[in-house]
Amino acid sequence: MGSRLGLIAGAGELSRAVLAEAKKSGLFCAVAGLRGAAPAGLEREADAFAWFGPADLDELAAFFRGHGIREAVMFGKIEHRLIFGEALGNGAIRALAAALPDHSPSTLLRALIEYLGAAGIAVRDPSRFLEPYGCPEGVLVPAAAPEAVETETAFGWPLVRTLADLDIGQTLVVKDRAVVAVEGMEGTDETVRRAAALAGPGVVVLKAARTRQDPRVDLPMVGLETVRTLVEARAAALVVEAGRVPFFQREEARAAAAAGGVALIGRR
């Protein structure tokens, strides 16, 4: 990467964390925030900032080019429903999507990346900015009933890995060795709320990356807000794939989980 970088910011604190890491490296950072998703305050932290919608790829590319930027990274959650709905309202994107084998999240995002590439903006691997945030392996917050959590995890772990590899979702919720909820377009937090409404307290939430995860595309992540959702749902545990799913605001999340009786576990 050169001395200038574009950041495409989706939902969650990942965008803010990555912007901070990039600026520590001395990069000029122009941020394009996804309207209705990117966290507030990025305008004050970026060297240049503009809002955009999922269909505004030409405007996004022009914004970056106007600041001398030819390379960008994409961070934060870009919900499938936004891409599937609003982005396909752009005729050029709709024509591109019509030629795709499916409209799964990774397929659509790769198509949008190719579209930006043709417009002169290369979307790069963001891994260099994520090193401080990897989820460690082991128990971060102990479970009240560790044997029960391990039983649920042993049941659900191969399922969530398969779910991720099938590009359906990256979150699975289980209880009593049964699948309660599978993440679809709604995202992790809404999946957890739905599971709690269906099965009550004590669910175990599992989150994993795809086996062949393209780090540019829909990288799974967890943070304080996700843990707060689990506490509200009175979940038993959150099990995250260690080393492959970034965990932001980890110390604050550990404190919230411990206070709320939710175990946090990193698993490979």
Model segments located where?
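Feature captures the catalytic cores and cofactor-binding loops of soluble hydro-lyases/lyases
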Residues: 34-67, 86-95, 189-268
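Conserved alpha/beta cores of soluble small-molecule-handling proteins
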Residues: 27-28, 32-34, 52-86, 110, ...
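Short coil/turn connectors at secondary-structure junctions
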Residues: 1-4, 25-28, 46, 67-70, ...
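General beta-strand structural signal in soluble alpha/beta enzymes
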Residues: 7-9, 31-32, 72-75, 105, ...
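Hydrophobic alpha-helical segments and helix pairs
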Residues: 88-143
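Conserved mixed alpha/beta catalytic, RNA-binding, or beta-rich assembly cores of soluble enzyme
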Residues: 22, 36, 123-227
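N-terminal basic/disordered segments at the start of proteins
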Residues: 1-34
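Short glycine-rich anion-binding loops that position phosphate/pyrophosphate groups of nucleotides
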Residues: 11, 77-80, 178, 210-211
